[in-house]
Amino acid sequence: GVQTCALPILVAPGTNRALKPGDRVAGYTQNVFQEPCGHCEACLAGDWDHCTNRRVFTWKGGELGHPGAYSQYTTWFPHSLVKLPDNVTNEEGAMAEPFAVGLHAIQVSQVKPNDRVLILGGGIIGMSCAEWARTFGASEITVSELNPQKREIIRGYQVADHVVAADAPDLEQQLLDISGGGYDLLIDCVGVPSAFNTGLRALKPEFYMRATAVGLPHAQFPLDYERLVLKQVLLRGSKGHNFDEFKTVINAMASGRISVKKYISRRIKLEEVQAGFEAMKAARGLDTKVIIETQ
């Protein structure tokens, strides 16, 4: 429940003078139990998500123990709420977080005009990366996706130039043919070793190609270390986003720089959440983003 748009009912005195009850806001992602310290190097740079003095538990280390936006009411640090412009809808506000994750990955990757970009995974983060890569001037975007039905959905978004089957036996050769000899940048949004290593092999043979890891692996990750060294690949990790990027996304929505509503697969009520998760599991990832309406 970290991707949210809400209406404040009560704003603690002296915390955020720009907000008042009834404003429409989007909530910058954070651990609701522990406010960023405000004095570490990350906080001083405005990167609260990477505060070195916070303890954040994830799916790998335990539960957050808080419903986040999976409830009618919740709490949020007031300084982490961004008031939405009048021409940004509530649904768009709820999409700010995943598109900030994509923006962060693209900025970490240092996408340049005319880059050929390979993205592994066609979920909301992969599509966010594709949208921002295009905005930053990428000339050719290829998305690799396992699910054949999802591949057709991705083609309908018209943001990727090529959508390929992640399980194709000749995938590496396909990628080299499509890109005319290799990509400038690999962005991994799935965390699957075989896919990542294939992506490494599909980078250009020239020096200093780039690879960015966004997806978290679910097990040990054997890396094609030899290929990494021989190609002198610049490998970066990308986690979350910072507050400036979050605000940039909202401003980009308001200006029309990016369009996000096409990625909303369907809408469900709060009481339908459990059934919604089961439907997502049964559909094996056909949804890109589901909006939960809490009222």
Where are these regions (language model features)?
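Glycine-rich cofactor phosphate-binding loops and adjacent beta1-alpha1 units
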Residues: 109, 136, 142, 148-234
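C-terminal hydrophobic helical "lid"/dimerization subdomain
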Residues: 169, 181, 193, 197-201, ...
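Glycine-rich beta-strand-centered segment in the early N-terminal region that forms part
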Residues: 6-44, 85-87
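Mid-domain Rossmann-like dinucleotide-binding core that forms the NAD(H)/NADP(H) cofactor-binding site
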Residues: 79, 85-168
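Single conserved hydrophobic/aromatic residue that forms the stacking wall/gate
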Residues: 1-5
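Rossmann-fold dehydrogenase core element
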Residues: 210-212, 222-263
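Cysteine-cluster motifs in flexible loop/terminal segments that predominantly coordinate metals
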Residues: 29-79
